[in-house]
């Protein structure tokens, strides 16, 4: 952030002037590269090398500059986001492989990993690939009697690339809500789809429709992103049904996801099954866990759930569960 660049030296000092000049030069360059509505700028090798040298040469300027210099030298993923309102830019860094940052500590020490998932098989495989032996795996039971989640995937459901997909899922969702007595949750990380769905339903159900707000009554309709729901579900009554229009495969439009995929591809790894699929299963698992309390319904309107092998694998990972072939009014 800008404050991390200008907080220490007097404005008149030569070092300060050099840093200010570099900041403004990069700002101009990044805004000239801006494409349509995208707020993210991917950096090429030349730009990364320039930033690496700059932060290394000025690492004594602040602890923040030193940390950035170290991160770049270790090959962290980096990208820039643009703030159109304030005409500023922010520089982001994130490790592609978090475990590699602490592996030297794990080799000679005992460690305990905690997972939010009921059974985290992907992470166990990940540790074994890194030659980190697991001595004991403990799966704790829930503090309530787990009921089977009822999974409904409409037959012959469209794929997301079908031009009629959005209209189709909106029409189906409206029918599913008509007979619902309890809370209906619509989950989507696609911002446009989430807003469109909330707007369409609000024109029918008015104030019953909420956009990422805590519901106060049983029969409300909540539209939210996965992250918002995971962070707030503890204070919300278990939904009667959760409607998922798109399986939560991480978007490669997000810089960290795109850079991780590129990194894994360069290493000839199966980037989909080793990165995107585990991330999707983990996000889905955490999002639907409240349904185990009341045997709630999970409705998946993404045709890939049946038509793709990995989609069927995601369905199989939801346990305990029971797939149903139809929905009955007030069932």
Specify the residue positions occupied by each region the protein language model found.
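Short, surface-exposed basic-aromatic patches at helix termini and helix-loop junctions that form
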Residues: 128-129, 199-206, 216, 234-240
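Short, acidic/turn-prone active-site loops that include or flank metal/cofactor-
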Residues: 137-142, 213-215, 226-227, 246-250, ...
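Generic beta-strand/beta-sheet core signal
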Residues: 114, 187-189, 212, 244-245, ...
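Conserved RecA-like P-loop NTPase helicase motor core
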Residues: 157-158, 218-309
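Short, structured coil segments at secondary-structure junctions
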Residues: 107, 130, 205, 237-238, ...
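Conserved helicase motor
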Residues: 188-192, 208-218, 223-231
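Conserved coupling segment at the C-terminus of the helicase ATP-binding
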Residues: 1-201, 304-313, 324-331
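Generic recognition of flexible, low-complexity loop/linker segments
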Residues: 98-103, 171-175, 211, 229-232, ...
């Amino acid at each position: 952030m800008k404050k991390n660049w200008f907080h220490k030296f007097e404005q008149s000092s030569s070092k300060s002037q050099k840093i200010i000049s570099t900041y403004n030069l990069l700002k101009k360059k990044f805004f000239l590269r801006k494409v349509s509505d995208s707020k993210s700028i991917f950096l090429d090798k030349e730009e990364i090398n320039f930033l690496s040298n700059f932060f290394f040469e000025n690492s004594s300027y602040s602890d923040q500059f030193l940390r950035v210099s170290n991160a770049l030298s270790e090959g962290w993923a980096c990208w820039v986001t643009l703030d159109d309102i304030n005409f500023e830019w922010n520089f982001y860094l994130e490790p592609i492989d978090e475990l590699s940052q602490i592996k030297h500590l794990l080799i000679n020490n005992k460690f305990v990993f905690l997972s939010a998932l009921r059974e985290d098989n992907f992470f166990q495989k990940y540790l074994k690939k890194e030659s980190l032996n697991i001595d004991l795996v403990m799966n704790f039971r829930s503090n309530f009697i787990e009921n089977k989640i009822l999974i409904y995937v409409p037959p012959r459901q469209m794929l997301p690339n079908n031009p009629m997909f959005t209209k189709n899922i909106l029409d189906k969702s409206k029918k599913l809500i008509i007979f619902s007595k309890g809370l209906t949750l619509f989950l989507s990380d696609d911002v446009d789809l989430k807003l469109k769905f909330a707007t369409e339903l609000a024109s029918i159900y008015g104030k019953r429709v909420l956009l990422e707000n805590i519901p106060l009554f049983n029969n409300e309709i909540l539209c939210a992103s996965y992250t918002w729901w995971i962070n707030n579900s503890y204070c919300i009554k278990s939904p009667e049904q959760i409607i998922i229009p798109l399986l939560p495969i991480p978007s490669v439009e997000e810089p960290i996801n795109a850079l991780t995929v590129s990194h894994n591809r360069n290493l000839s790894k199966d980037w989909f099954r080793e990165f995107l699929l585990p991330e999707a299963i983990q996000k889905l698992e955490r999002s639907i866990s409240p349904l185990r309390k009341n045997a709630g319904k999970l409705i998946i309107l993404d045709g890939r759930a049946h038509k793709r092998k990995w989609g069927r694998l995601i369905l199989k990972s939801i346990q305990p569960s029971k797939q149903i072939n139809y929905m009955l009014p007030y069932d």
